[in-house]
Amino acid sequence: MIIHPKVRGFICTTTHPLGCERNVLEQIAATRARGVRNDGPKKVLVIGASSGYGLASRITAAFGFGADTLGVFFEKPGTASKAGTAGWYNSAAFDKHAKAAGLYSKSINGDAFSDAARAQVIELIKTEMGGQVDLVVYSLASPVRKLPGSGEVKRSALKPIGQTYTATAIDTNKDTIIQASIEPASAQEIEETITVMGGQDWELWIDALEGAGVLADGARSVAFSYIGTEITWPIYWHGALGKAKVDLDRTAQRLNARLAKHGGGANVAVLKSVVTQASAAIPVMPLYISMVYKIMKEKGLHEGTIEQLDRLFRERLYRQDGQPAEVDEQNRLRLDDWELRDDVQDACKALWPQVTTENLFELTDYAGYKHEFLKLFGFGRTDVDYDADVATDVAFDCIELA
């Protein structure tokens, strides 16, 4: 079928299979350009592997270090008559090109919060991956979590705490500057956000993997977080989501103590602001990202997801000089270091009050933001003919959990 973008709110309801594949190829090329090393992870599990930082982790592990990878995600497959989600096509493209490079690649499509997903992962590690993994990447960003056992459903809330937050934002449907107000989260919403986006599920994964004996000696685990700056703190770090990320930090300390007994470790990696399906949903982020992209591009500091993950693997987790990774006082790996430079943030603060609907495209990189957003769904690429027919029914080596 012929597929063009249809954007509603912060979601594009259509996806382009070929565009998604080209995006993955672009990330593979960026990784390969930095050279392939053989002194890093060999067997990698990525939980939340189909888009954003999770996908970039999988690409970096496979094409930067020659690792075998197992990816878990929750996506909709395409059929002959309907396109699937972007994450499905990203994962299909990854699988195709990893196999072409002679690398082991297997995927599981299902609820990554479920015990069934953990059981399936453990079975595959035992039967197909040599029995153990040496890196576990935890990269789930979900609005909903169904608790294993009880089946109770918890929902996360993108809300401030204590008082209504009002700030300048972009109406991304109309490309206009508006005042956005968000009501504060209730105590229950804060609690549920911690349950969905905190460290509980990460710990359940490590419990299960360790209990089954499928974690290698020296195995590491990393989970992703975002702290941001005072511009975004009210809605993020000081909001319900921030409380969940504090829980993630506490979980990392516990897991690190456990894994360190066998020569490994666990860290939270704090990453920079990038255009992802997760960040597009957070009010104020599109405007902040549009500003910080412009400033960082001008300073030669800009990074996308794959550049961030390359730096995380090559300069933090698996340093060639054999030294331990540089961490902050909470044992976090900081990849938001360039974004948080004083010169970058001072420029952002000076720019923020000046932005209007009329000068939005001129003062910020909102055009770049829109382009990156469409790219998430396979659109906006110059090397794809969007008026040509494309097959939407793309199958690959993926186990479907019932």
Swiss-Prot record:
Changing residue 50 to A: Same reductase activity as the wild-type. Restores fatty acid synthesis in the E.coli fabI mutant. Keywords: Fatty acid biosynthesis, Fatty acid metabolism, Lipid biosynthesis, Lipid metabolism, NAD, Oxidoreductase. It holds the Pfam family Eno-Rase_FAD_bd. Substrate binds at residue 226. The keyword Lipid metabolism applies. NAD(+) binds at residues 48-53, 74-75, 111-112, 140-141, 245, 274-276. Pathway: Lipid metabolism; fatty acid biosynthesis. Changing residue 113 to A: Slight decrease of catalytic efficiency. Restores fatty acid synthesis in the E.coli fabI mutant. The record marks 75 as: Plays an important role in discriminating NADH against NADPH. Changing residue 226 to F: 50-fold decrease of catalytic efficiency. Restores fatty acid synthesis in the E.coli fabI mutant. Changing residue 245 to R: Loss of reductase activity. It is not able to restore fatty acid synthesis in the E.coli fabI mutant. Its EC number is 1.3.1.9, 1.3.1.44. One of its GO terms (biological process) is fatty acid biosynthetic process. GO terms for molecular function: enoyl-[acyl-carrier-protein] reductase (NADH) activity; NAD binding; trans-2-enoyl-CoA reductase (NADH) activity. The active site is at 236 (proton donor). Changing residue 246 to A: Same reductase activity as the wild-type. Restores fatty acid synthesis in the E.coli fabI mutant. It is an enzyme of class 1 (oxidoreductase). Monomer. PANTHER family: ENOYL-[ACYL-CARRIER-PROTEIN] REDUCTASE [NADH]. HAMAP family: FabV_reductase (MF_01838). Involved in the final reduction of the elongation cycle of fatty acid synthesis (FAS II). Catalyzes the reduction of a carbon-carbon double bond in an enoyl moiety that is covalently linked to an acyl carrier protein (ACP). It can also use crotonyl-CoA. NCBIfam families: EnoyACPredFabV (NF043048), PRK13656.1 (NF010177). Belongs to the TER reductase family. This is Enoyl-[acyl-carrier-protein] reductase [NADH]. It comes from Xanthomonas oryzae pv. oryzae (strain MAFF 311018). The lineage of its organism: Bacteria, Pseudomonadati, Pseudomonadota, Gammaproteobacteria, Lysobacterales. The gene is fabV.
